């Protein structure tokens, strides 16, 4: 997978970098050769939305298990979200604790994101100096007490600092007023079925949150990134903002592109995420937004938990909101993309190039090109498999993908020119803990 598209080629690796890309029959003698056959050789995926949860909640997920899952899924770089670990990454001390926990455990490259919470605007400069690549905030409760939602006043405090730093603010964009209104109307005797849960997170809340963020951006221009867009209602607002040159990027996730609300079995809380999986027309509109470029990228929002936190007698309100999918994203997206006549080049643009650009790594990751890091995924675009939870590498096997037939099998993953994964076997951890280049 070259910048010009799919073509037969030989990728020459020297040390940790791609030194040369030549014709398919230009194979040098006297050096080790890996023959990928007819498989696709692509830049490794960059996943900028992963909850690893270590330290503090490593019984949910940890660096070793998450990064093994990443390597098995062709993901060569992950970015750890600032919440669900204890402490949350809202100070330099917490970032240091994260790095210490990750050291020596990572099978792929790992970067870190900082958190914006009420009252920590004074910490943001130090976090940037210490090496976070971007910041994250919630407009509604995050689900964990140590990472509270921000108000508009908190945003007004943080925006000038973020403007000075030039780093993106990644936002969980649901407007709290619309969420409160929907939940006020909810029947207290609810059994927590999926239809009720879906109604409690209305699509308009996402559109209104995007509009709120654009108003704040009017006052103080900073790069804004909308995480896990599930509602197509916001697409028209985003298109209009882009037409005016606004610095706003958008991601969606494999689960929003795979399922619709009709597919969610009653009581199957493994499908619970926030914002929720919506109707079929919405899913198709998200695909249209990807294809026309309104949505920039696809990332996992890998958010695992203890199995007991999903086993809540089918109550979607009390179950943990998060889907475990880090190992399966490439296959899930390719399965659906093929149905829409998309190519591996589209997948590379959405899952390699755009996420690398978001975090400022587009000069070294996301492409098979001279001078880029030799982070490489090799996969068979025609092979199919049925998801067997016992073969998933993340800490717990609870996932809505269990039993689903997917197309696209990752065979081999290289990290910085070193073999990290091949056909179910792993080398020793060889990932790097990333810091931004100055």
Where does each model-flagged region fall?
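Histidine-rich, glycine-flanked metal-binding segment
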Residues: 1-43
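Divalent metal-coordination and catalytic microenvironments
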Residues: 16, 38, 49, 70, ...
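Metal-associated gating/positioning segment near the N- to mid-region
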Residues: 36-105
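Alpha-helix-loop-beta-strand connector modules within alpha/beta enzyme cores
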Residues: 42, 92-108, 155-171, 328, ...
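Active-site mouth loops of central-metabolism enzymes
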Residues: 48-61, 84, 89, 108-120, ...
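Histidine/acidic residue-rich metal-binding segments in metalloenzymes
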Residues: 122-137, 141-298, 314
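His/Asp/Glu-enriched, well-ordered alpha-helical/loop segment
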Residues: 194-223, 270, 291, 296-298, ...
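C-terminal cap of metal-dependent C-N hydrolases
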Residues: 315, 370-435
């Amino acid at each position: 997978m070259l910048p010009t598209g799919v073509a037969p080629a030989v990728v020459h690796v020297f040390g940790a970098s791609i030194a040369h890309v030549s014709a398919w029959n230009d194979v040098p003698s006297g050096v080790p050769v890996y023959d990928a056959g007819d498989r696709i050789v692509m830049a490794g995926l960059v996943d900028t939305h992963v909850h690893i949860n270590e330290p503090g909640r490593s019984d949910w997920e940890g660096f070793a298990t998450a990064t093994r899952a990443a390597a098995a899924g062709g993901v060569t770089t992950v970015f750890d979200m600032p919440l669900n670990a204890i402490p949350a990454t809202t100070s330099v001390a917490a970032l240091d604790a994260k790095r210490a926990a990750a050291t020596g455990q990572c099978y792929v490259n790992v970067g870190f994101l900082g958190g914006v919470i009420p009252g920590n605007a004074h910490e943001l400069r130090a976090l940037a100096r210490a090496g976070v690549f971007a910041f994250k905030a919630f407009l509604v409760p995050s689900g964990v007490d140590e990472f509270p939602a921000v108000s508009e006043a908190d945003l007004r405090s943080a925006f000038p600092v973020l403007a000075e730093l030039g780093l993106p603010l990644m936002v969980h964009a649901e407007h709290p007023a619309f969420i409160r209104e929907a939940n006020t109307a909810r029947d207290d005797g609810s059994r927590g079925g999926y239809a009720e849960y879906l109604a409690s997170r209305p699509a308009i809340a996402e559109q209104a949150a995007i509009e709120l963020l654009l108003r704040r951006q009017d006052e103080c221009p900073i790069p804004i990134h909308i995480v896990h867009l599930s509602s197509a209602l916001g697409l028209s607002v985003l298109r209009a903002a882009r037409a005016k040159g606004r610095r706003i990027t958008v991601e969606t996730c494999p689960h929003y592109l795979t399922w619709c609300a009709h597919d969610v079995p009653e009581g199957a809380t493994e499908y619970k995420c926030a914002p929720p999986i919506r109707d079929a027309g919405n899913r198709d509109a998200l695909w249209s937004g990807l294809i026309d470029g309104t949505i920039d990228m696809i990332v996992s929002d890998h958010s695992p938990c203890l199995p007991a936190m999903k086993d809540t007698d089918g109550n979607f309100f009390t179950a943990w909101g998060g889907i475990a999918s880090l190992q399966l994203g490439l296959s899930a997206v390719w399965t659906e993309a093929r149905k829409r006549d998309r190519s591996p080049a589209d997948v590379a643009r959405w899952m390699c190039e755009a996420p690398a650009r978001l975090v400022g790594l587009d000069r070294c990751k996301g492409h098979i090109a001279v001078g880029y890091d030799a982070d490489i995924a090799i996969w068979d675009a025609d092979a199919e498999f049925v998801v067997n939870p016992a073969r998933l590498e993340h800490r717990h096997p609870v996932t809505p993908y269990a039993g689903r037939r997917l197309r696209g099998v990752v065979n081999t993953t290289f990290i910085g020119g070193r073999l990290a994964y091949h056909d179910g076997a792993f080398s020793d951890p060889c990932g790097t803990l990333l810091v931004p280049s100055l």
